[in-house]
Amino acid sequence: MPVSAPADVFGFNYDGSWGTSGLDVWHHHDHGRMSIEVARGKKYFPEWNTARWWLSHEAFQRDPERFLANFDAGLAIFASHGISVIPVLFNRWRDPFCDFGGVPIDHILPWASSWTRSDDLFEDASRGASDVTPVERLFGEYVDAVVAGHAGDPRIFAWDLCNEPLMGRYVDDPESELRAAEVKWLRWVAQRTRLLGAEQPLTIGNYANTTAIELTEPFTDIISFHPYYMWSGHESQPHMATKEGFVEFLDEVSAFAKLKGKGLIANETVWGARDHSTHVEVMNYTLNQLVPRGIGFTVHALHHSLVADLHRDQYGPVGNAEWMHFIEPDGSLRPGHEAFNDFAQSQRASRAD
């Protein structure tokens, strides 16, 4: 059955195994390989009901028709397994170890480049192509093409407007021009999506920062965030590097969501590890904190991939997150990771007793 509420979300992020970036994954999309990888996930995790699927506006710009055809075909793959989808429209997480690609800050900051020469950049989502800057036109064409054709698509549970925006110290500075510009752009994406008649809820995949969550809440319908308990985390981030801080952070975000009357999804969670048992231990601890609070989740991530954080060392640069994937390149499940099924809907009642 399709997922019906944020608290019921049980699943994974998905990036195809064959690419090193969003552009690479989508420009060289492999429908057959995707079919195999999603089927593997459903075999290992029968109650998997939601996939957070990363898109690429850069790939769309290079071949719009092919991108849209692959997007629709991919939705069909997920639907054939009873999996609802949260497409991620844009990305602002830029990893220096193995950059996924996405939106650079100079594309959303007024006058920061030749393509953003406007004092009122992203001021009005309803303006036509002849009245806007090049970047507004390009982003608008992408959002229009992707959302308009699926505005009422029951295969889509929600639209994630952007992955991890506001991911810098400036987010806590009310006077920051960067912060103001980024929030304005995010609001523009939300407005554009609603103007297209999207019937699905809107959300934003915020990293673990309460200010970012508070800034993006007014123009989203579901609060999404990325609660990672980081066993290898830095002391400068105690809300992720310590269990005490992690619990306090979850309680703070849960209280905020309740205050606003909105559902809550951890649409990225479970920090990685090269060691299988360490990864399983982190998974068990993290999900044991999320489930009692009624927080749905899409763990990062389902399958080994060449993109950042999802591959073994021999496949490319590996950062602090080490290995976050559940399924190996040969299709086998990492040892002990079947424990993810203990957190499925059918198991939650017994766990609560």
Q: Language-model segments: which ranges?
A:
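Short histidine/acidic/glycine/proline-rich micro-motifs that form metal-
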Residues: 57-59, 270-274
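Active-site neighborhood of phospho(di)ester-bond hydrolases with catalytic His/Asp-centered motifs
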Residues: 204-205, 265-268
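Substrate-binding surface in catalytic domains of secreted glycosidases
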Residues: 233-253
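Histidine/acidic-residue-rich catalytic or RNA/ligand-binding cores of hydrolases
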Residues: 275-289, 309-317
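Catalytic domains of carbohydrate-active enzymes that cleave complex glycans
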Residues: 290-298, 330, 338-353
